Amino acid sequence: MSQLTLTLLMIVAAYLAGSVSSAVLVCRMRGLPDPRSQGSGNPGATNVLRIGGASSAAMVLFFDMLKGALPTYLAYLMGIDAISLGLIAIAACLGHIYPIFFGFKGGKGVATAFGAMAPIGDDLAICLMASWVVLVLISRYSSLAAIITALLAPLYTWWLDDRFTIPVAMLSTLIIIRHKENIQRLLKGEESKVSRKKRPKAP
């Protein structure tokens, strides 16, 4: 099989893997409202945190990251070049953003993009996660944390393993474009802050 054929097959496989909406499936299994019609309307871990609590959000986060990590890492093991790895990672994110199995209404792709970047190295994964967590704790805006972390990701990659700077920059660009509406709401002071589902008070 030629390198081009293998790359195209992995792009299709990555898109299909990304199209499995973890948020919708976890909410269905746990009897929670559809995240596409509740909270922010975004089927991602942050919105599931709002409507279903931390454990449900953690499940969504894990599986969304896995959707990006598995196809990208498998392609890396197959010897696919760095630029093609970037295209495969983008395909996984596009599947998450526009899932064919869920009416093309998906999330922002942040966790899936992080999952695709994480196999580059533990040091990069730690830098990205630490940046996002610190920014969320400071600002309470998940979207702002994601945008700034996406901007930092190519710089971290260039510093730690410059072979993958271009693929990571491609992913970061996609994430920032996907947050266009969030950027507008942030500028207007209308963006929702991170909050957990409130437990009902005991009678």
From Swiss-Prot:
The terms describing its cellular component in GO are:
plasma membrane
The family classification in the record reads: Belongs to the PlsY family.
In short, the EC number is 2.3.1.275
Q: Which residues form the signal peptide?
A: none
The metabolic or biological pathway listed in the UniProt record of this protein is: Lipid metabolism; phospholipid metabolism
What is the organism of origin for this protein?
Answer: Shewanella sp. (strain MR-7)
Known Pfam families for this protein? Answer: G3P_acyltransf (PF02660)
The name under which this protein is listed is Glycerol-3-phosphate acyltransferase
